[in-house]
Amino acid sequence: MMVPQQGAVVKLDALAFAYPGGQAMRFDLLVPASEIVALMGPSGSGKSTLLNLIAGFERPDSGQVLIGSGDVTRLPPFKRPVSMIFQENNLFSHLTVEQNVGLGRSPTLRLSDGDRAAVSEAIARTGLAGKEQRLPRQLSGGERQRVALARVLVRRQPVLLLDEPFASLGPALRDEMLDLVAELHRDQQMTVIMATHDPRDAERLSNRLLFIENGTIAADGATSSFLAGQGPPAFARYLGERKRLR
């Protein structure tokens, strides 16, 4: 049985970054251990960049990324105590469900008996029992994201980053996946930072919302307050534009 764990504090201290020829971005952020935070904002505002800076896929020009008690600013992604799920490309197409989940324990898939037990438990926990030997192409979109969540379970990292992983799913399946994330959070108490364009995602999963605009955190507050119209005018305009596009 998986032992309960605790999330880690995530702190971005004067973190500066710019793509070549792009706008300068700056992030200052403190996320307490085990909190769930939603990131919302226009496309290109910096949501994915913020997540990639935490995960280590982008290197800041200056500033620090702190996770728990450690400075991880210069660490490569595989050495950071972070798991991340994207909208696509979470799985290796030539590996089975069991193998894709097993990568969370060992990149060489040399698994101990304890590792195999953890993989089996995670597969069952995410509703994939009986599909261990299937390839990703034999799964539905929702099932593929369940495999990604199962891999998160066996990695047992204190921080989970979600970059619109359920955006391509229909409303019912999307809600089901968000509920599964919430259930895993209750058990493992990991810190969760989720980028989304859908206010329903934020409302369902998080109590705190950050509005990202022009490469910075433009507003930070309770999700309920933002969605009740108490956020900045720019957030209301953003939601209005999203509704027009749907």
From Swiss-Prot:
Residue positions binding ATP: G41, P42, S43, G44, S45, G46, K47, S48
Which reaction is catalysed here?
thiamine(out) + ATP + H2O = thiamine(in) + ADP + phosphate + H(+)
Q: InterPro entries annotated for this entry?
A: AAA+_ATPase, ABC_SmlMolc_Importer, ABC_transporter-like_ATP-bd, ABC_transporter-like_CS, P-loop_NTPase, Thiamine_ABC_ThiQ
State the protein's name: Thiamine import ATP-binding protein ThiQ
- What does the UniProt keyword field contain? ATP-binding, Cell inner membrane, Cell membrane, Membrane, Nucleotide-binding, Translocase, Transport
Query: What is known about what this protein does?
Result: Part of the ABC transporter complex ThiBPQ involved in thiamine import. Responsible for energy coupling to the transport system.
Q: What is its EC number?
A: 7.6.2.15
Gene Ontology CC: one annotated term: plasma membrane
Organism phylogeny: Bacteria, Pseudomonadati, Pseudomonadota, Alphaproteobacteria, Hyphomicrobiales
As one GO molecular function, the record gives:
ATP hydrolysis activity
Give the PROSITE patterns listed for this entry: ABC_TRANSPORTER_1, ABC_TRANSPORTER_2, THIQ
Localization, per the record, is: Cell inner membrane
Classify the protein's membrane topology as the record does.
Peripheral membrane protein
The UniProt entry's sequence similarity note says: Belongs to the ABC transporter superfamily. Thiamine importer (TC 3.A.1.19.1) family.
Subunit architecture:
The complex is composed of two ATP-binding proteins (ThiQ), two transmembrane proteins (ThiP) and a solute-binding protein (ThiB).
Question: What sort of enzyme, by top EC class, is this?
Answer: translocase
Domain named ABC transporter: residues: 10-239
Query: Sorted alphabetically, which NCBIfam families does this protein's record hold?
Result: thiQ
Task: Locate the transmembrane regions by residue number.
Answer: none
Q: What is its main location?
A: membrane
